[in-house]
């Protein structure tokens, strides 16, 4: 029995010893192993757009993209941003997935643009991408143009709109505006003589015809037609060119309805043809100082931001159809109208739509069709004074917050350059039928106004566009 007790005590002591040796005691727990730290590699550049060393890149706003080998983040530090030489950074850079994107402005030909992505701008958690630089070169300066389109630009030169007069509209057939002409003025021969002496080459005579028509066959009031003709005669006597158009007749030219209803479209086309036949017959013996313009600013009331963006191009096709009808109608009257220059607008007379594929020039055996555009960019500066929520400054010296971003000098150059490349270089004249800027409320703001007007004029001249002040 004594031996048995000794054995039991010995066994218990051994078990305790084993337990302690195996770390089973709560006073001395085994530490948790630390997993190895994974290696974080910095993002590296796979490609750029434009590619490094690329040449013949179009001038203007250049979209740049830098693609990395993994999803990346961008620093919030405002001092870190792409560094550009040979151009300027427009707006802010952004990242999406593996791509860093931003816009570079460069309006100069044959210019090397170098882009540097500084270290610290791009990275992932735990690692920053190294600094990266690449460059590309803009296209060569095109040969100086010398064709019918540039010759016509010189002939039209700088002009003035006889606006707020014959374009006055009541919005009703047979009902002249109850307030009379909006300009409350009576043109005389002296007006046109003085315009010529001031350096004006062209007068755009804007006319609304529908207020002086009552019903089918849409005969234009004879006295009204005579008054319009008198002004054209005065301009001719002064040695001016004249662009005569159909202006605020949009109230019966409902392009949204016409684009979706063939009966309405046929009725509108019938009236367009009958109206333009009368105009063309009245002036068919006039010389080549006279130009016709099919329409003013045909649009659905939303100035290019309406149903035209979602209707599958129906409104654009309808306007193309109307422009073709006007050209055919004028040519059919014979006389000097067989070869008279005719201006046609794109949707809303917008350069944007004139540069898109939805705008199709009319076919013309005489090959004498011009493109008419209007330029009021940015309208927050040109059409809206600062006391009515507009911007007070414009251009590269404008103060932060006082100008419309994306619409400074680079935008003017890019727009006019594209018009020249698409049309003038292909012997199709382009004229800016309207441009201008409202008076602003401070001397400083009006200095920017003056700079804007001068810049637009100089740019138009550079790119062979004639222009007519509103």
Predicted regions mapped to residue ranges:
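N-terminal carbohydrate-binding accessory modules
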Residues: 141-202, 422
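Conserved small/polar residues in nucleotide/adenosyl-binding loops
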Residues: 469-470
């Amino acid at each position: 029995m004594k031996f048995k007790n000794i054995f039991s005590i010995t066994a218990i002591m051994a078990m305790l010893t084993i337990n302690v040796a195996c770390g089973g005691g709560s006073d001395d727990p085994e530490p948790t192993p630390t997993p190895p730290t994974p290696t974080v590699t910095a993002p590296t550049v796979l490609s750029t757009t434009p590619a490094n060393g690329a040449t013949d890149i179009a001038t203007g706003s250049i979209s740049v993209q830098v693609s990395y080998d993994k999803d990346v983040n961008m620093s919030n530090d405002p001092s870190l941003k792409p560094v550009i030489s040979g151009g300027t950074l427009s707006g802010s850079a952004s990242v999406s997935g593996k791509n860093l994107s931003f816009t570079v402005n460069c309006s100069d030909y044959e210019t090397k643009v170098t882009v540097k992505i500084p270290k610290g701008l791009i990275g992932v958690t735990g690692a920053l991408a190294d600094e990266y630089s690449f460059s590309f070169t803009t296209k060569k300066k095109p040969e100086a143009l010398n064709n019918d389109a540039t010759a016509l630009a010189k002939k039209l030169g700088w002009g003035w709109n006889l606006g707020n007069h014959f374009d006055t509209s009541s919005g009703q057939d047979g009902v002249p505006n109850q307030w009379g002409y909006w300009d409350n003025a009576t043109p005389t021969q002296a007006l046109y003589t003085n315009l010529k002496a001031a350096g004006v080459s062209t007068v755009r005579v804007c006319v609304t015809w529908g207020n002086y028509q009552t019903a089918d066959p849409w005969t234009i009031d004879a006295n009204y037609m005579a008054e319009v003709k008198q002004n054209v005669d005065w301009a001719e006597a002064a040695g001016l060119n004249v662009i005569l158009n159909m202006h605020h007749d949009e109230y019966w030219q409902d392009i949204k309805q016409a684009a979706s209803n063939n009966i309405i479209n046929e009725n509108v086309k019938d009236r367009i043809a009958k109206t333009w036949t009368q105009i063309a017959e009245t002036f068919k013996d006039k010389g080549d100082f006279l130009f016709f313009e099919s329409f003013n600013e045909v649009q659905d009331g939303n100035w290019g931001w309406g149903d035209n963006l979602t209707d599958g191009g129906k409104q654009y096709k309808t306007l193309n159809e109307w422009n073709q009808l006007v050209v055919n109608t004028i040519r059919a009257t014979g006389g000097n109208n067989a070869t008279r220059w005719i201006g046609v607008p794109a949707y809303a007379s917008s350069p944007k739509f004139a540069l898109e594929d939805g705008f199709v020039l009319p076919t013309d055996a005489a090959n004498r069709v011009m493109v008419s555009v209007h330029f009021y960019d940015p309208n927050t500066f040109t059409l809206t004074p600062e006391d009515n929520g507009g911007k007070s400054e414009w251009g590269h010296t404008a103060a932060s917050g006082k100008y419309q971003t994306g619409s400074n000098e680079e935008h003017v150059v890019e727009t006019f350059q594209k018009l020249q490349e698409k049309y003038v270089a292909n012997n199709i004249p382009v004229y800016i039928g309207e441009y201008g800027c409202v008076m602003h409320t401070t001397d400083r703001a009006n200095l920017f106004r003056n700079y804007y007007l001068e810049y637009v004029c100089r740019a138009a001249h550079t790119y062979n566009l004639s222009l007519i002040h509103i």
